C-alpha cells in the first residue's frame, strides 16, 4: 500500500490525516489505519475494488482522542488567533499549488522511480526545495517582456543603486540579497490565513538598468519603470537601493494619475534636505517628492524619526512644509495602534492613494546590521510588522523597501526583515481585499521621460 494526505469533514470541522491505501480489501485498510493512526476510530463505507485500485481516498470520519478532553481541546484555546487561523486554512483553495506541481512535473520531468512522492519532479521547477532554484522574488515567475506585467496583480522590480549614499555603500546589492533569502518563505501565512499563491498573482520583472555614475539618469530610469508598472494595473514593489530612489519612485507613480497621493515613510532619518554634497542624495527624497503637485507635503507621514543622524539642515524644511513627524518617543507614549491611526488620518486626508516607503534602518540596528546608516533605538521587528500591517489595511498604491546593504549584513537577517515587510504588506492587503484598489486612480497614460 501507500499513504496519501487527505482532508476529512467531521462534526467538529475538517481534519487532515495520512490515509493508508491498501489495494486489497476494506479489512486490510482498517488494519492498516489502526497501525498508522491508533488514536483514531474509523468509519468507512464499502468501496469497490476498482476504486481502491484507482487509489481514491476512502470517505470517512475521524474522532481524535485527546487526553481526557473528549473531542475538544481546552476551551480557552478555541478563541485564540492560533485556532481561528487553523480553521480558516480549510477555506483556502489549493488549485494553484496543484497546478504548480503538475507544471513542475511536465517541465522538469518525473522523479526517479525510487522516490515515493510522485509530486516531486526530476528538476526543481517550483517552490521546493527552498535551497534550490532560480532566485526570483519568492520564486515568482520571471517576466522578461514588460508588456506582460499587467497580467499580474503585483510586480517586484529591483532598483540596484547606491550612488546616492553618503556613508556605507552596498545597497546596489539589496535586490539580490532580498531575492536570495525570499526562497526561505512559502506563500502561506498561518496567522493571516492567507496564501499569496492562491489569492493573487505575483511576478518578478528583474532589475531596472541603473547608471552607477549618474544619479539623475538613474532617477529617470526608475520613474519610467515604476510609472509603467503602475499604469499596467500591477501593484509596484520596489527593492532598493538607497533611499535616494524614494523621489523617482513616487514621481513615477504620480505621473500616471491626476489624483492626490499621500506617503507613509518609515525611517530614522528625515530625508528632506534639498541637497547633500550638491546632489539629490539619499538624504533628500522627500524634499523633491513633496514638490510634485499631486504629492503635497501635508500628506507625508514620517514614522521613527530621531537620534543623532538627523541633519539640522532638514529640520527647517520639515517646519516649512508642515510634514507629519512621529518619533520613537511618540510611539512609546502613544502606542502602535494610535500612531497607525494618526498616520492613516494624515496620509489619507483628501488623498486618493498612499505610497509606502520603508527604510530598513527604521528598525533598531541590533536587528538589521546590513544597512548604510545604522542607528540604535529604532523599532523592534514586531513593532515594525504591526505598524506596517495596520497602515496596509487601508490599501496602498505601491511600496518600496530601501537601504538593505548585504555586504554589511549577518546571516541575511536584514534582507530577511525586508522580505518580511513586503510579504506582510501583501498579505494584509489580500486579507482585507485591498490589493488592486489603486487601479481606479490610474487615469493618465504612461509617458517615458
Protein language model regions, located:
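N-terminal mitochondrial targeting presequence
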Residues: 4-7, 16-70
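Aromatic-residue hotspot detector
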Residues: 2, 58, 136-140
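Conserved alpha-helical scaffold segments that buttress catalytic/binding sites
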Residues: 70-449
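Hydrophobic alpha-helical membrane-insertion segments
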Residues: 12-14
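Conserved small/polar residues in nucleotide/adenosyl-binding loops
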Residues: 1-5, 399
Amino acid at each position: 500500500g501507500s499513504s496519501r494526505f487527505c482532508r476529512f469533514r467531521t462534526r467538529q470541522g475538517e481534519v487532515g490525516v495520512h490515509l493508508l491505501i491498501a489495494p486489497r480489501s476494506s479489512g486490510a485498510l482498517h488494519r492498516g489505519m489502526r497501525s498508522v493512526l491508533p488514536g483514531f476510530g474509523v468509519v468507512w463505507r464499502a468501496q469497490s475494488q476498482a476504486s481502491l485500485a484507482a487509489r481514491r481516498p476512502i470517505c470517512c470520519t475521524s474522532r481524535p482522542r485527546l487526553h481526557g478532553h473528549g473531542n475538544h481541546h481546552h476551551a480557552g484555546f478555541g478563541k485564540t488567533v492560533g485556532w481561528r487561523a487553523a480553521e480558516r486554512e480549510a477555506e483556502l483553495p489549493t488549485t494553484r499549488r496543484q497546478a504548480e506541481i503538475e507544471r513542475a512535473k511536465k517541465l522538469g520531468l518525473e522523479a526517479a522511480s525510487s522516490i515515493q512522492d510522485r509530486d516531486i519532479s526530476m528538476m526543481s521547477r517550483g517552490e521546493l526545495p527552498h535551497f534550490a532554484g532560480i532566485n526570483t522574488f519568492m520564486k515568482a515567475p520571471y517576466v522578461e517582456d514588460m508588456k506582460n506585467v499587467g497580467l499580474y496583480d503585483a510586480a517586484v522590480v529591483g532598483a540596484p543603486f547606491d550612488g546616492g549614499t553618503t556613508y556605507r555603500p552596498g545597497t546596489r546589492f539589496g535586490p539580490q540579497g532580498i531575492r536570495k533569502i525570499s526562497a526561505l518563505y512559502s506563500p502561506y501565512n498561518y496567522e493571516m490565513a492567507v496564501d499569496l499563491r492562491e489569492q493573487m498573482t505575483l511576478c518578478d520583472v528583474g532589475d531596472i538598468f541603473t547608471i552607477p555614475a549618474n544619479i539623475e539618469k538613474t532617477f529617470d530610469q526608475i520613474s519610467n519603470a515604476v510609472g509603467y508598472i503602475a499604469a499596467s494595473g500591477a501593484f509596484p514593489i520596489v527593492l532598493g537601493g538607497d533611499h535616494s530612489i524614494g523621489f523617482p519612485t513616487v514621481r513615477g507613480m504620480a505621473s500616471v494619475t491626476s489624483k492626490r497621493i499621500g506617503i507613509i515613510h518609515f525611517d530614522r532619518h528625515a530625508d528632506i534636505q534639498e541637497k547633500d554634497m550638491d546632489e539629490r542624495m539619499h538624504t533628500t527624497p522627500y524634499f523633491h517628492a513633496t514638490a510634485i503637485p499631486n504629492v503635497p507635503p501635508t500628506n507625508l507621514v514620517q514614522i521613527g524619526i530621531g537620534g543623532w543622524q538627523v541633519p539640522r539642515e532638514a529640520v527647517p524644511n520639515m517646519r516649512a512644509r508642515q510634514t507629519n513627524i512621529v518619533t520613537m518617543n511618540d510611539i512609546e507614549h502613544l502606542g502602535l495602534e494610535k500612531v497607525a491611526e494618526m498616520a492613516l488620518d494624515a496620509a489619507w486626508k483628501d488623498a486618493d492613494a498612499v505610497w509606502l516607503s520603508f527604510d530598513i534602518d527604521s528598525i533598531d540596528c541590533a536587528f538589521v546590521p546590513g544597512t548604510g546608516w545604522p542607528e540604535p533605538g529604532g523599532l523592534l521587528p514586531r513593532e515594525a510588522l504591526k505598524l506596517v500591517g495596520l497602515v496596509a489595511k487601508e490599501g496602498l498604491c505601491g511600496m518600496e523597501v530601501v537601504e538593505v546593504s548585504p555586504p554589511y549584513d549577518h546571516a541575511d537577517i536584514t534582507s530577511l526583515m525586508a522580505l518580511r515587510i513586503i510579504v506582510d504588506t501583501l498579505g494584509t492587503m489580500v486579507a482585507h481585499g485591498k490589493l488592486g484598489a489603486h487601479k481606479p486612480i490610474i487615469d493618465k497614460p504612461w509617458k517615458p521621460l
